[in-house]
A protein has these predicted regions:
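Ser/Thr/Asn(+Pro)-rich, low-complexity disordered segments
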Residues: 191-405, 435-444, 536-814
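Extended amphipathic alpha-helical segments with heptad-repeat/coiled-coil character used for oligomerization
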Residues: 473, 481, 485-552
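Aromatic-lined ligand-binding clefts that engage carbohydrates, nucleic acids, or primary amines
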Residues: 102, 106-120, 154
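Extracellular and analogous surface-interaction loops
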Residues: 90-92, 96-108, 144-149, 203-204, ...
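Active-site cradle of extracellular carbohydrate-active enzymes
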Residues: 401-450, 454
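Accessory carbohydrate-binding/adhesion or oligomerization-edge regions at the termini
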Residues: 1-75, 155-196
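Extracellular beta-rich ligand/substrate-recognition surface
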Residues: 83-93, 131-136
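Beta-strand-rich ligand-recognition modules
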Residues: 119-171
Length: 814
């Protein structure tokens, strides 16, 4: 083969990868400030050992790490991204190799992008390095590659601290001589087969019930519908693969939203995942005549669904069974081996897996409701006495204590565990049970004080509100009366906010933290809560958190269904954010102001000297550093914040983001669709939302993209810089200052990109109540006459103006 061209913006996109090599990691250093502690661990973990002789770099051969070399393929990506989640701490090594070909000797300027520590070698010579890993934002290192005529081996030796969501990402961007460089891989014998397989997969076109390709499938091509299982027991069952060799098209089964196509040639393996958007539809639990079940009937159906799952999957390695066990106990269901699952769960708590506080919280609920005897009773006692209930207690682990949901989980677990064993000694806490109970109680009160005053930081999160709900009802059920009442009121507030943002068939809301389910408002986790309240709505599994509710006396407040169904135009504050919401029969438009009106944000105490790190205020500040700020301002680095939606129902919704990743592979926060790499300026007023996205040179991804699932709308019209959308009586129009280009990644006919680091968008909403027809709406939208001045970074339209003033937020560097 003659070699591949460089990718978008000069990125090298063809690599071989070895690893990750994962080793248990322990460090004897101690620090009660976990923020400072993990920063220290990142500063010392990289060893930067010289690479030396690499040996032959061949697909299937072992590298210097004693891990196999693999050809790396990730459709559309500009990076090697092998990010994953580590429940216990690990030392991570991974190596990356590519070949740059030139016809003459040239010195090439390049930019290395990574969150890891990386040494870059060109033909065995060290050319530059990133000295230590960071959590965020991504690091950039400019360097010079001294290329010789012919093939040049570029070798990246990468090291990272594996703790929770770990960004094992690296990219190499060529800044000059781009037309003089071709890319290959070290394994020349595999290069042709890789090129054939990749060209085949990249030629895919997804249409309803078919996958089309430009050429017959190569030998070794197969496909599967398997993607993700809620039940860990089912996740362990091998996927069924169907042969596709020689086929130009694959006929797809209805009801199968995911298809993975794999090409294998010897030890070479390439995969591409496709998501059939139209096959992902709302799920309803209704009677045969289409009517809704009563609240009590529906509640039992919810508990039954949770009980039927053996253990909630936490990835490929293990599951968390406690919610499922609680649901089975509700039915006195002994059909599964729950004793074995309990012992496995206790082992995970004892080893202090990240999120083991979820298990502990459920275990406490179990003990309050069901008798335990004999060896199990003693084992539970031993595990609970020796647990690490806060980050300043003895122990070394990678647990996240500080997010809004985790903090409350740990606080209430400490309060309840201490109360259960009042006279016992908790060695990691160095407290008696009575002392631990008071310690946890004080922290719970501080958490309630904060949320009552400021509102939620993880506001409207359709993932984490389910977790917080489970923690709150433990406080409601197992606390003294006054605390219980306050916790119930906060729970009422949380459910009221979610109900307010429930629009027709889904939750349409900006969010403090979000994941990829943001694409499907009808299928987000918190729809499990909304379906509990209103059985007419679609249901979701919601990670099984409602298993906690099977033994709770918390009463769902009245009036929530009315909040879901009434028209509203309002704004309110939560955390440091101001949220805008307008919903009616025709459309829903919602956003956060960026920036909001002048106000004083709450003070981040991690930036102060001699601060009391034992308070919840410090924990909350800590969380802002890790999990992103609700102080929305243009130019601030993003995390998991979702900033706006326009929707015609829970399926037909649109939004724009600056992606934090160039593909959907890897566990990234921000990701391809969830969160923003850099926050935009946003302003909402009646039926109108404007956004300005300016991407700094310090960020590697130079485009923004629109999520617009065309199959969800009855009518879609592309006209110059406009897209016009209709569903039933609702209308949307989106204008971009750049000409948008369609892109097909995991989803087809869902994405439009604006390849510019400086772009503006205007979203106009309407419907039959305000417009005589769709044609009349189109005319009205165009008459807003949007215009964007790149120099002054000002977006203007009829009765609308927004300017972009860049802000920096020191809390978002870690």
């Amino acid at each position: 083969m003659s070699g591949w061209k460089l990718g978008l913006d000069g990125f090298v996109t063809h690599f071989m990868v070895s690893g990750p090599q994962e080793e248990p990691y322990f460090n004897e250093a101690k620090d009660k400030n976990q923020l400072r502690y993990e920063a220290y661990l990142r500063s010392v973990i990289a060893e930067h050992k010289p690479v030396g002789e690499t040996g032959e770099i061949l697909v299937g051969a072992k590298s210097r790490l004693n891990e196999e070399w693999k050809y790396y393929y990730d459709s559309g990506s500009c990076f090697v991204n092998i990010s994953t989640f580590y429940s216990v701490m690990r030392r991570i090594h991974f190596d990356i190799a590519t070949v740059l070909e030139t016809s003459s000797d040239i010195d090439v300027k390049a930019a290395l992008w990574s969150y890891a520590a990386v040494d870059v070698y060109c033909n065995g010579r060290l050319e530059g390095a990133l000295k230590q890993p960071v959590y965020k934002p991504i690091q950039k290192k400019e360097l010079t590659l001294h290329l010789k005529a012919g093939r040049n081996l570029i070798y990246l030796a990468c090291e990272n601290l594996g703790v929770r969501d770990t960004r094992s990402v690296a990219g190499l961007q060529i800044l000059n001589h781009k037309d003089e460089i071709k890319v290959s891989i070290p394994d020349e014998a595999c290069a042709d087969a890789a090129a054939v397989a990749e060209a085949f997969l990249e030629s895919a076109r997804l249409e309803s019930n078919k996958l089309w390709f430009d050429s017959p499938a190569p030998a070794g091509t197969s496909y599967t519908y398997r993607y993700h299982e809620e039940d860990f027991a089912k996740a362990k069952i091998p996927a069924v693969w169907y042969q596709a060799e020689g086929k130009n098209e694959i006929l797809l089964e209805n009801g199968q939203p995911y298809v993975t196509v794999k090409v294998v040639s010897g030890k070479l393996e390439l995969k591409r995942v496709f998501e059939r958007t139209e096959q992902l539809v709302p799920k309803y639990a209704l009677r045969e005549d289409g009517s809704a079940f009563s609240f009590e009937e529906n509640k039992e159906l919810i508990f039954r669904r949770i009980a039927d799952v053996m253990s909630e999957s936490r990835g490929e390695k293990f599951g968390f069974p406690i919610s499922n066990i609680l649901a089975r106990k509700h039915f006195n269901d002994n059909s599964m081996d729950d004793e074995r699952l309990m012992y496995e769960m206790l082992e995970m708590i004892e080893e202090r897996y990240d999120c083991s506080d979820f298990l502990m919280c459920g275990l406490i609920r179990y003990l309050h409701n069901y008798p335990v005897e004999g060896a199990m009773k003693e084992r539970i006692k031993d595990v609970m006495l020796n647990y690490r209930y806060w980050m300043d207690m003895d122990g070394f682990d990678g647990m996240c204590f500080w997010s809004e949901n985790h903090a409350l989980m740990f606080y209430t677990c400490a309060m309840n565990a201490g109360e259960m064993y009042p006279d016992e000694y908790f060695p990691r806490a160095k407290m008696t049970g009575k002392e631990l109970h008071l310690y946890g109680r004080n922290k719970v009160l501080q958490w309630l004080d904060d949320v009552e005053e400021y509102g939620f930081e993880e506001f409207l999160s359709t993932v984490y509100m389910c977790v917080t709900f489970a923690a709150l009802i433990n406080v409601v059920d197992y606390s003294e009366s006054e605390i219980s009442k306050r916790a119930a009121a906060v729970t009422d507030k949380m459910l009221s906010m979610l109900a307010l943002h429930t629009y027709k068939t889904g939750i349409v809301a900006p969010m403090g933290r979000v994941y990829r389910s943001v694409l499907y408002p009808f299928d987000q986790g918190a729809m499990a809560l909304m379906n509990l309240i209103n059985p007419k709505l679609p249901y979701t599994f919601g990670e099984g958190w409602l298993g906690f509710y099977a033994s709770s006396h918390y009463p769902i407040p009245e009036g929530l269904v009315k909040l879901m169904e009434d028209d509203v135009e309002t704004n309110y504050t939560t955390g440091n954010a101001r949220v805008y919401l307008e919903k009616n029969d025709d459309y829903c438009l919602t956003s956060v102001a960026s920036p909001r009106e002048p106000f004083t944000r709450w003070e981040n105490e991690t930036l102060k000297e001699d601060v009391d790190i034992t308070t919840h205020n410090f924990t909350k500040s800590f969380n802002e550093r890790f999990h992103g700020t609700t102080y929305f301002r243009p130019g601030t680095y993003g995390y998991q914040q979702h900033m706006w939606y326009a929707a015609l129902d829970g399926e037909a919704s649109i939004f724009v983001t600056h992606p934090g990743s160039t593909s959907e592979e890897g566990d990234m926060r921000p990701g391809y669709w969830h969160g923003n790499g850099v926050m935009p300026a946003l302003k909402q007023q009646h039926g109108l939302l404007g956004g300005i996205y300016v991407i700094p040179d310090e960020h590697p991804i130079g485009y923004t993209h629109l999520y617009c699932p065309e199959c969800r709308f009855d009518e879609v019209i592309h006209e110059e810089n406009w897209i016009f959308l209709r569903k039933e009586t609702g209308y949307l129009a989106l204008w971009c200052s750049e000409k948008m280009e369609a892109h097909n990644g995991m989803n087809f006919n869902c994405e439009q990109r604006a390849y510019s680091k400086n772009a503006a968008y205007l979203c106009v909403c309407g419907g039959q109540k305000s417009d005589a027809s769709f044609a009349a709406f189109k005319k009205r939208a165009k008459e807003t006459l949007p215009s964007y001045d790149k120099e002054s970074k000002t977006l203007t339209a009829k009765n609308f103006e927004l300017s972009y003033v860049e802000c920096k937020d020191v809390t978002q560097f870690l």
